[in-house]
């Protein structure tokens, strides 16, 4: 007896016994274990309970307990013969980050605090980021997907040119790319993998938010494979803690970064990010360290202390700040939640 990767355990010994050996479920014949003694005015009922492996949880409207009826069918009181499913746990890293460490010139993430972080390599070995949001889907920016492609490139053209790694450089195959229908204003794309990835300590999706976590002052963490203080790509995942900034100040900062008539840079940035109702800004930390080239596509991860769960509040779109600008710019995940869910459901 098996059920979608679940482990089945016997609640009361009887004619059928299902045991858990490691992650395998083994049936034992009727005569392999003694029958329970009879009791006066009572009877023996055979029950099994479905449980999930580590890093998965049971999804069912019932309680996961099934009884053997007179027709030798396993049924649950609430859902009948319908079996439960084991869905991947999200936003529950085994080793959550517990101190401030940074991307630019910072310390390393040696503990797997960001198991949703993916490393994406595009044409000509340009490194960017992507964020695992389910067993088979990742978020990244449209700009990342179009790197070294013409503006006329299609999603079908782009997908074969990407290489994607999860966990400890686990290579995963890409099935397709889906661009946001308004990607010039909403810098987002989805990546679908050919197969679901096993969820474990090093590979785990981050949860999608059910509310907007981007109020000014909220602190989040951004991990990344982008360039370090020497402007060379790092071989190790690093991270930074940054506060959400005032949007008006952020807009004013970038509006003043160029002279409108001839676009002569007034500061080292000189590039205009996309800023609109779908974006928010995160400011420089007090350590004067920041995200940089190659970190785009990574998530602004928020730890909801009440739920003890990590949520993807945003996706880094503008990663050109590199300590010379005050703000990085992110796409609000909550604003595109409906598109994400509909796209995944229809694909």
From Swiss-Prot:
Transmembrane segments: none
GO MF assignments: antioxidant activity; hemoglobin binding
SUPFAM superfamilies attached to this UniProt entry: Complement control module/SCR domain, Trypsin-like serine proteases
SMART domains per record: Tryp_SPc
Tissue expression remark: Expressed by the liver and secreted in plasma.
Pfam families hit by this protein: Trypsin
PROSITE patterns with a match to the protein in the record: SUSHI (PS50923), TRYPSIN_DOM (PS50240)
GO process annotations (BP): acute-phase response; defense response to bacterium; immune system process
Keyword Hydrolase: no
Gene3D superfamilies with a match to the protein in the record: Complement Module, domain 1 (2.10.70.10), Trypsin-like serine proteases (2.40.10.10)
The Sushi domain, residue ranges: 31-88
GO cellular component: blood microparticle
Domain named Peptidase S1: residues: 103-345
Spans annotated as Interaction with CD163: 259-264
UniProt subcellular location: Secreted
Glycosylation site positions: 148, 152, 182, 230, 256
N-terminal signal peptide: 1-18
Subunit structure: Tetramer of two alpha and two beta chains; disulfide-linked. The hemoglobin/haptoglobin complex is composed of a haptoglobin dimer bound to two hemoglobin alpha-beta dimers. Interacts with CD163. Interacts with ERGIC3.
Family: Belongs to the peptidase S1 family.
Function noted in UniProt: As a result of hemolysis, hemoglobin is found to accumulate in the kidney and is secreted in the urine. Haptoglobin captures, and combines with free plasma hemoglobin to allow hepatic recycling of heme iron and to prevent kidney damage. Haptoglobin also acts as an antioxidant, has antibacterial activity and plays a role in modulating many aspects of the acute phase response. Hemoglobin/haptoglobin complexes are rapidly cleared by the macrophage CD163 scavenger receptor expressed on the surface of liver Kupfer cells through an endocytic lysosomal degradation pathway.
Notes on the domains: The beta chain mediates most of the interactions with both subunits of hemoglobin, while the alpha chain forms the homodimeric interface.
Protein name: Haptoglobin
Organism: Oryctolagus cuniculus (Rabbit)
High-level lineage: Eukaryota, Metazoa, Chordata, Craniata, Vertebrata
This protein's encoding gene: HP
